[in-house]
Swiss-Prot record:
Domain of life according to the entry: Bacteria
Organism per entry: Mycolicibacterium vanbaalenii (strain DSM 7251 / JCM 13017 / BCRC 16820 / KCTC 9966 / NRRL B-24157 / PYR-1) (Mycobacterium vanbaalenii)
InterPro entries assigned to the protein according to its UniProt record, in alphabetical order: KdpA
Subunit and partners: The system is composed of three essential subunits: KdpA, KdpB and KdpC.
Cellular component, GO annotation: plasma membrane
Classification via NCBIfam families: kdpA
Transmembrane is among the record's keywords: yes
Annotated TM spans: 5-25, 65-85, 133-153, 176-196, 249-269, 283-303, 377-397, 415-435, 483-503, 526-546
Protein's UniProt name: Potassium-transporting ATPase potassium-binding subunit
Membrane topology of the entry: Multi-pass membrane protein
């Protein structure tokens, strides 16, 4: 079987599985967020944190709760890393010293669901920090994104109210009822497939067949691996992430991991359709995501299977940076999926991809990661794109734009437009400043177009809360730790505030009945329009920088 055909079959099986769970998982999440009943475990948590599960919040109160919870989480994780040497299960001789700048960067990274790692995981953090710090944030940062998405959907579904639900209820339910059960099942499957789960020390030394000695780092890997992918977090227990055989041993576990990082994001549109009372609207949204995802998967496979140059021609594909047990096609599907979502985990070395293959990965993130995007973040991103699309359509026919019975007034379009200006501003400003500083340019291992691509990739990944890297620059410096940390903070929380403000504005409106001039937003025409607007927005914003980086390298 050819490599290309194997990749197509691998991808087809993945799509079939995602289609199969779309309805049941989407309906289950609808019930989770719309029931009035709380479990005993949830009531215990509410009492511990002092939350009233019956109280509703305005968009401002909801946003303040998100920010307060995230700030406390950041402070806890920051301190935990700095004092880890005094804690049980700490590493006796960490490979990477934990400086305040690195602790800040790492804490921000995991709290914002980015999981950018400027350190080697297995030689920096002990088991306690991995479990009580990083793994916990993998759960709750994903639950925060889902909560914000549900709040925005309530803004469309409700009328003449200022209330969007209760953040603490949405956070707890998303964690306990959705993320925890699926993660337990996924961890068992990964252990069955060969991923490790133990509490062995880092300093296990074994004798190899060649007579040398090798250190084998153990740890509770499978449990963290499951939520790493399911919550679109991406931070690996090991430095090489899912390319490590202890995290991702076989093609079977590789398939499971790709499925996990896509499954919730592709099922949330069904939840959206149920909540607004029109399932066809959910199908339209997932249709947009599917169109963009198929384009990305196809383009990545095409560019990575091209045989240009002596070595690629000899082996039939671009094999540099690819794990042999996965092959080019499966690695390309993983790379496209991890950048289409906000996951950022890797099973191959993105910096070694062909210039145009790397361009696709960059472009995936620059889409705003809406195809399907991160857990929760992808849904609220694509819904705001839908708002912009109906506004553009309204301009063309001279009517006040409407979406799901809500008028898109100047206030709504200002919020939506600002939402999509935030991330490009962070990315382009950060890249420009880094390239203008001689000290930061000295940390680049490559010059020319590829060096620019590496810096652009770093800020694109940080601002879009992805976390993957081209890895050709030295980022464990005070400047990069601080700058990328700020990019992650602003790239996460400014869009969340704008999305919640939009939700509050929409919830206060009444419902406008559809008329003969209303744009149908459940048909293929609308799917094509949203996909087109998305691609045009990204092209207009980033094309000059892409032309100087990966495009110039590809042409050369």
């Amino acid at each position: 079987m050819s490599t290309g055909l194997a990749g197509i079959l691998f991808l087809a099986s993945l799509v079939i599985a995602l289609v199969a769970v779309h309805v049941p998982l989407g309906d289950y999440m609808y019930r989770v967020y719309n029931t009035a009943k709380d479990s005993r475990a949830e009531n215990v948590v509410y009492r511990l944190i002092g939350a009233d599960p019956k109280a509703e919040q305005t968009w401002g109160a909801y946003a303040r709760s998100v920010l307060a919870f995230s700030a406390v989480s950041l402070l806890f994780l920051f301190i935990l890393q700095l004092v880890q040497g005094r804690l049980p299960s700490a590493l006796t001789d960490p490979g990477t010293p934990m400086t305040p700048a690195l602790a800040w960067n790492t804490a921000v990274s995991f709290v914002t669901n980015t999981n950018w790692q400027a350190y080697s995981g297995e030689s920096t953090h002990g088991h306690l920090v991995q479990m009580a710090g990083l793994a916990v944030q993998n759960f709750v940062s994903a639950a925060v994104g889902m909560a914000v998405a549900i709040a925005l959907v309530r803004g469309f579904a409700r009328k003449r109210t200022g209330e969007l639900g209760n953040f603490w209820v949405d956070l707890v339910r998303g964690t306990i009822r959705i993320l925890l059960p699926i993660s337990v099942i996924a961890a068992i499957l990964l252990i069955t497939g060969g991923a490790i789960q133990n509490f062995h020390n880092y300093d296990q030394v074994v004798n190899t067949l060649a007579g040398a000695q090798q250190t084998i780092p153990g740890g509770p890997v499978a449990s963290q691996e499951a939520i790493k992918d399911l919550g679109t977090n991406g931070g690996g227990f090991y430095n090489v992430n899912s390319a490590h055989p202890f995290e991702n041993p076989t093609t079977w576990t590789n398939w499971i991991e790709i499925f996990l990082l896509l499954v919730i994001a592709f099922s949330l549109p069904r939840t959206f359709g149920r909540m607004v009372g029109n399932k066809k609207q959910g199908y339209a949204i997932v249709g947009v995501q599917a169109v963009l995802a198929v384009i990305s998967w196809s383009a990545t496979l095409f560019f990575q299977l091209q045989a240009h140059g002596t070595v690629p021609t000899a082996v039939g594909a671009a094999m540099e940076g690819v794990e042999q047990r996965f092959g080019v096609a499966n690695s390309a599907v993983f790379a496209a999926s991890t950048t289409l979502t906000s996951t950022g985990s890797v099973d191959s070395f993105h910096d070694s991809y062909t210039s145009l293959g790397g361009l696709v990965l960059l472009f995936n993130m620059q889409l705003g990661e809406v195809a399907p995007g991160g857990v929760g973040a992808g849904l609220y991103g694509i819904l705001i794109l839908a708002v912009i699309t109906v506004f553009v359509a309204g301009l063309m026919v001279g009517r006040t734009p409407e979406y799901l019975g809500k008028k898109i007034t100047p206030r709504e379009i200002k919020l939506a437009a600002t939402y999509f200006l935030v991330t490009p501003l962070i990315v382009l400003t950060g890249t420009a400043v880094a390239m203008a500083m001689p000290g930061q340019r000295a940390g680049m291992l490559n010059t020319g177009p590829h060096g620019l691509s590496e810096v652009l990739y770093a800020f694109t990944s940080a601002a879009n809360n992805n976390g993957s890297a081209f890895a050709g620059i030295t980022v464990n410096t005070e400047w990069y730790n601080t700058a990328l940390g700020l990019a992650m903070v602003f790239g996460r929380f400014l869009p969340i505030i704008l999305a919640l403000a939009l939700a509050g504005s929409l919830a206060q409106q009444g419902k406008t009945p559809p008329s003969i001039g209303t744009l149908p937003t459940h048909r293929p025409q609308f799917v094509g329009m949203v996909a087109g607007v998305t691609l045009i927005l990204v092209a207009l914003t980033f094309l000059p920088m892409l032309a100087l980086g990966p495009l110039a390298e590809g042409i050369h």
